[in-house]
Amino acid sequence: MDIENDIRNRRIIRNISNLLDDDILCDVIITIGDGEEIKAHKTILAAGSTYFKTMFTTPMIARDLVTRVNLQMFDKDAVKNIVQYLYNRHISSMNVIDVLKCADYLLIDDLVADCESYIKDYINHDTCIYMYHKLYEMVHIPIVKYIKRMLMSNIPTLITTDAFKKTVFEILFDIISTNDNVYLYREGYKVTILLKWLEYNHITEEQLLCILSCIDIQNLDKKSRLLLYSNKTINMYPSCIQFLLDNKQNRNIIPRQLCLACHDTNYNVCNPCILVYNINTMEYSVISTIPNHIINYASAIVDNEIIIAGGYNFNNPSLNKVYKINIENKIHVELPPMIKNRCRFSLAVIDDTIYAIGGQNGTNVERTIECYTLGDDKWKMLPDMPIALSSYGMCVLDQYIYIIGGRTQHIDYTSVHTVNSIDMEEDTNISNKVIRYDTVNNIWETLPNFWTGTINPGVVSHKDDIYVVCDIKDEKNVKTCIFRYNTNTYNGWELVTTTESRLSALHTILHDNTIMMLHCYESYMLQDTFNVYTREWNHMCHQHSNSYIMHNILPIY
C-alpha cells in the first residue's frame, strides 16, 4: 500500500509539473528580471505561499482572469527556483541568500527553513561578517540572529580582520547599539570598536553623532575618554565635539515639544493638520496639513519625522497609503504603501522599524500585523494577533508592543469622535484583553485581562510599568482612572488614582515622570498631568483661537 501511495504521489506531482511546462490553464503571470515572464497557477502558488494566498483572495484581484505579479526586485534565477519549489520540484542549485530573501518576502516558511539550515551548516567564524552583511536587514529570521550572536561573541578577534575593515556603517551601528544583555559591551570597548573602524572608513557627521549617542560618555574610563576626545575624525565635526561636551554630566531625555495631529473644526472635520506644541508655554503653531483629507489614520514619530498611515476619507472606506512629513522643512514624502488597508489602528515604533497592527479594513476588523523598516521598498507580514482588534490602546516597552482593549467588530464610518474612550451604552464588542507582541521572537503573549472593556485608552510605559488611562462610568458619573501593571511581577492591574472626567478623548503621553493628558475642547487647550511618584494631579487650561479635535500626540526630542 505504501508503494502504491508513493507511486500515486509521484504521478500527481508529475501531472502538476506538466501543467507548468505546457502553460496549461495558467492564470497568473510573474514578471522577473529583464522583463522575462513566468506563467503559473494561482492555486499552486497560494498553496505554498501565504503572500500569494493573501493576494489572490483579495476581492479585486480574485475577479481577474489573469493576474500579473511583479517580482523584478529579486534575482530572476531565485524567483525561477522558488516557482519550481512551489510545484514540488527539486532545486538542484541556488544562490541561497537570494532565494532566502525572496522566500521570506513571499512567506514560504518551509523554504525559508531549508535555506536557514543550509546557511547554518555553512557559517563559521571566518564567514559570519560576510553573511551578516548580506542578511542583517532580515533580523526577524532566526538564522540572522544566530549569525549576529556568532559575530558578537567573536568581535574581539574579528575587529582585526579585513572583513571588519570593510564593514558598512549599518553593521558597525548595529554592533555598538545592541541592547542584547548577553553581548552588551562595556562602554570603553565600544570606543575601541569605533576607533578601529574609523581607521579604515569614512563617516559623515550625522552617522558619527548616531554612533556616539550609543556610548555612555559619562561612564567612560579615563583612557577611553582621552582616545575618543583626541580622535582626528571626531574633531572634524563640531556637533560631535559639542555632544561630548554636553554629555559630561547625565541629562534626562524628555520631549522638548509635542507634535499634535488634529482636525480643525472651524473649517471642516476632514481638514487634518499638524501642530507643534510647547509643553511649558502651552503655545502651538500649525506646521502642515495631512494629505487627502483623511481621518482615523495612525501616526508616529521616527527620528523626529512624522509618519501618517492608513485612515479613510469619504471616497475610500480604508486606505493603505503612508506618508513621512519632515517637521523642519514640512516636506511630504510618500513611503511604500501597507499591504493591508487600515483605519482605527496604531503604529508602534521600535528603532527604525514601524509596526502597523490590526485596525478596520472595510467591514472587517484585522488580526494582521505588518512592519516596515525605513529605507526598505516594501512592508512585510508578521504573525497574526490572537484576536481581531481596532481602536485599542498601545505602547512600546523594550522589545514588546502592548495592546490593551479595543473593538472586536467594525463600526460605521463616521467623523472623528470627541469622546472615544467612554462606553456610555452596553457594548459586547469591546475587549478587555491585554496582549503583547515580542518583536525579537515574533510571538504573541496573553497577559492578565484589564478591569473592563475599553476603547482607545491612553497607554504609556514608565520604567517597568505600563499605565492605562481611561474613562469608566459608574452609577453616578464618569471618572478618569489610571491603572498600573508591573511587567516584572505579573500581578495584574492596580487602580492608582481617579479624577473627574473632562468627557473628551484622552490623548496621553509620558513627559519626564508625569503622565500628561491633552484635550482640545471648543476654544480651550486643557492640560492635565499626574506625577507617578508623588501621585499628584495638576490641571491647566489655556484659551486659543481655533477649535480642534485632537487625534494623537507624539514626542519631539
UniProtKB/Swiss-Prot annotation:
Protein's name in the database: Kelch repeat and BTB domain-containing protein 2
Domain BTB, chain residue ranges per copy: 26-95
Any one annotated GO CC term: host cell cytoplasm
First and last residues of every Kelch repeat: 305-352, 353-399, 401-464
Superkingdom assignment: Viruses
Main location as per UniProt: host cell
Keyword Transcription: no
Residue ranges of every copy of the BACK domain listed in the record: 133-223
Keywords, ordered alphabetically: Host cytoplasm, Host-virus interaction, Kelch repeat, Modulation of host E3 ubiquitin ligases by virus, Modulation of host ubiquitin pathway by virus, Repeat, Ubl conjugation pathway
Entry domain remark: The BTB domain is responsible for the interaction with CUL3 while the Kelch repeat domains supposely serve to recruit the cellular substrates.
Subunit structure: Interacts (via BTB domain) with host CUL3.
Subcellular location: Host cytoplasm
PANTHER family named in the record: KELCH-LIKE PROTEIN 32, LD33804P
Pfam family name, one: Kelch_KLHDC2_KLHL20_DRC7
Gene3D superfamilies: Kelch-type beta propeller, Potassium Channel Kv1.1, Chain A
A single GO BP: symbiont-mediated perturbation of host ubiquitin-like protein modification
Functional note: Probable substrate-specific adapter of CUL3-containing E3 ubiquitin-protein ligases which mediate the ubiquitination and subsequent proteasomal degradation of host target proteins.
SMART domains: BTB (SM00225), Kelch (SM00612)
UniProt-listed InterPro entries: BACK (IPR011705), BTB/POZ_dom (IPR000210), Kelch-typ_b-propeller (IPR015915), Kelch_1 (IPR006652), SKP1/BTB/POZ_sf (IPR011333)
